Each structure stands twice: as structure tokens, then as C-alpha cells.
Regions:
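Start-transfer (signal-anchor) and selected internal transmembrane alpha helices
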Residues: 1-22
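Perimembrane helix-loop-helix junctions
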Residues: 196-216
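Extracytoplasmic loop-helix module adjacent to an early transmembrane segment
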Residues: 22-67, 79-80, 148
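Membrane-interface alpha helices of multi-pass inner-membrane proteins
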Residues: 175-191, 197, 202
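Short hydrophobic alpha-helices at membrane interfaces in multi-pass membrane enzymes
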Residues: 164-184, 213-216
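Membrane-interface micro-motifs in multi-pass membrane enzymes
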Residues: 118-163, 190
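Transmembrane-helix motifs of polytopic, lipid-linked glycan transferases
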Residues: 95-114, 157
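Loop-to-helix entry region of an early transmembrane alpha helix in multi-pass inner-membrane enzymes
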Residues: 84-100
Length: 216
């Protein structure tokens, strides 16, 4: 986080903690419903009605999703999260992911300058007011959260990496391998995010006549 945040670390820490506590509480208190039970049922069907962890049952679950739903990694992770992960643990993980989304978005907006408390608050408020969290898609449900929040964070990370490489700042080997892994996860996690991102990157490459750095 060095260089990312402004010098007013106390106020920034309070805002970050508030974001995490609010979303962790919201996710923890929100009951499972709708598609949570659908993927729950798919795992039970694939595992002969047993809720217990089973490699063969999970492989059957993944196979059925691949054949009859899609190859989306988020859906493949849904049953393990819903059935086996403590709800409080997932609520905390989800809250950290959401906080990282706000920090990443603020960092992209601010360029190379540190993120100030005011900017982070502004990004947070804009997301609350402008994004459709209040509609009927129930984005705080466990399976919907898996579909959208990790995908958003992975997409922002990939955009940041592409921008950094495109501006001539390359990654060293170890970090570049990590970026490749993140880009791969971005591609397989949710096609609703990865396909538009791929289209945008393709347009950028075409406008530059594909004269991009090798890492790009």
C-alpha cells in the first residue's frame, strides 16, 4: 500500500475500517436465498443428496455446470462457499474485496498520485448512488457476490496492469507472472466482465496498430 494512500493515514484507516465493517455486517446478516439454493441443490444432486465435501461430488457438480450452465468459475465456487465456508468468514472476505474495489477505482481515477480520504469517500458515495445495488438483482447474496465483486476487482487489476505496461512501466518477472495469473482469473471468473474487457483491449491495440509492448 506504500505510495497508494495519502499521508493522512488515520482518517484513511477509519474510512477503510468503516467500509469493511459495514459490508461485512450487511453480508453476514443477509440470508442465503434465490440462486444460493439453486447451486446448493445442484451440488446435492451431483453428490447423491449429501451435503458433505466430496471430490467426486464436486467434480460431478463442475461437470454439470459446464454441460448445462456455463464454465464460469464464480458458479463453480458457489457450492463450496455456500455449503462449507463459515458465513462470517465469507462476509469478511467479501467486505475486504469491496473495499479493495473502491481503493482500486480511486487509484485509477487519481493516476500516480496517492489516494486521499476525500477521493475515497467520493468514489464510495458515487458507487452507492450510481450503481444499481438497490435493484432486484440482490448483489449482496453469496452467489451473486461471487459473480460480481471478485470479477470487478480482477477487472480493475487487469486494467491497471494494462495501463501501466502501455505507459512504458514494465513488470519484473515474478510480478509479471502474478499479473498473467490475475488476467487468467479475470477471463474465467465471469464472461460478462472478461468479454467486454477483451473487446476494449482489442480496440486499443488496433488503434495503436498492434505496436504494443511485449508484456501487453
Amino acid at each position: 500500500m506504500k505510495g497508494l494512500l495519502a499521508k493522512d493515514t488515520t482518517l484513511m484507516s477509519i474510512i477503510i475500517l468503516a467500509i469493511i465493517l459495514i459490508y461485512a455486517s450487511f453480508s453476514w446478516l443477509c440470508p442465503i436465498m434465490i440462486d444460493d439454493y439453486m447451486f446448493w441443490d445442484k451440488y446435492l444432486t451431483a453428490n447423491n443428496g449429501s451435503i458433505l465435501p466430496s471430490l467426486s461430488g464436486y467434480c460431478n457438480y463442475v461437470r454439470d455446470l459446464w454441460l448445462y450452465e456455463n464454465g464460469r468459475l464464480a458458479n463453480m465456487l458457489c457450492a463450496p462457499v455456500v455449503l462449507w465456508m463459515p458465513k462470517l468468514a465469507w462476509a469478511i472476505i467479501l467486505a475486504v474485496i469491496i473495499c479493495a474495489i473502491y481503493l482500486s477505482a480511486a487509484s485509477l481515477v487519481n493516476g500516480s498520485r496517492p489516494v486521499s480520504p476525500l477521493l475515497l469517500m467520493s468514489v464510495w458515495i458515487c458507487c452507492i448512488l450510481l450503481l444499481p445495488w438497490h435493484d432486484y438483482s440482490s448483489l449482496m447474496l453469496i452467489d451473486y457476490a461471487l459473480n460480481y465483486f471478485p470479477s470487478t476487482l480482477l477487472t480493475l487489476a487487469t486494467i491497471w496492469a494494462a495501463y501501466r505496461i502501455g505507459s512504458g512501466r514494465r513488470f519484473r518477472n515474478a510480478r509479471y507472472c502474478l499479473i498473467i495469473f490475475v488476467a487468467f482469473l479475470t477471463g474465467v471468473f465471469h464472461e460478462g466482465f472478461s468479454m467486454p474487457l477483451l473487446a476494449a483491449l482489442s480496440v486499443i491495440a488496433a488503434t495503436r496498430r498492434f505496436s504494443m509492448p511485449g508484456q501487453w
